[in-house]
A protein has these predicted regions:
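Conserved ABC ATPase signature
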Residues: 25-29, 33
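A short, surface-exposed alpha-helical micro-motif characterized by mixed small hydrophobic
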Residues: 92-94
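Conserved ABC ATPase "signature" region
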Residues: 3-20, 129-130
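Short, glycine/charged-rich "phosphate-handling" switch motifs in NTP-dependent
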Residues: 98, 110
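Short catalytic/signature loops enriched in Gly
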Residues: 19-20, 112-161
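A short, proline-enriched helix->beta-strand linker immediately N-terminal to the Walker B motif
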Residues: 44-48
Length: 161
């Protein structure tokens, strides 16, 4: 039953299910294959919520799209809610319904993705949106000035006030 479940999950993330492939070590897999094995492991437990911390970091654009498509399909097929932790606004715009923007360990703005990106209310959100590359426009990318606050030296209240 265990081996059958492993093969079932590997097939769901579009990886080979033959015994030779299942015997491979992580270093014998590409980054995208490693991500999909991680997804198979996570969904094998039949969770109601899955936390994805930077699920596409270090992947090329085509592999990134394939991994995100796989995540989208798995969450729909299994009725699983997904919590994405990412700095990649393109991922959020593509996959999320709602977003919470954090700064220095605190949620500074939250709401529907379309509204937050169209009308960002908080300074940090405006900075993030302005810093995101936009292939459709010719605007220059705006860098984020400064450094993140150290956890033990966070200001009281809003750092932007």
């Amino acid at each position: 039953a265990r081996k059958a479940r492993i093969k079932e999950m590997m097939a769901e993330v579009l990886l080979p299910t033959d015994d030779e492939y299942l015997e491979r070590y992580p270093h014998q897999l590409s980054g995208g294959q490693q991500q999909r094995v991680g997804l198979a492991m996570a969904f094998a437990c039949r969770p109601s919520v899955i936390v994805l911390d930077e699920p596409t970091t270090g992947l090329d654009v085509s592999t990134q799209e394939h991994v995100l498509k796989t995540i989208r399909q798995l969450t729909r097929d299994h009725g699983v809610a997904a919590l994405y932790i990412t700095h990649d606004l393109a991922v959020i715009a593509d996959l999320a319904d709602d977003v919470a923007v954090m700064y220095s360990g605190r949620v500074v703005e939250q709401g529907e993705v379309s509204e937050i990106f169209k009308n960002p209310a908080h300074t940090e959100t405006r900075h993030l949106v302005a810093a995101a590359p936009d292939i459709a426009s010719k605007k220059s990318i705006v860098g984020l000035a400064g450094r993140a606050q150290s956890p033990g030296k966070r200001p009281v209240g809003c750092a932007f006030a």
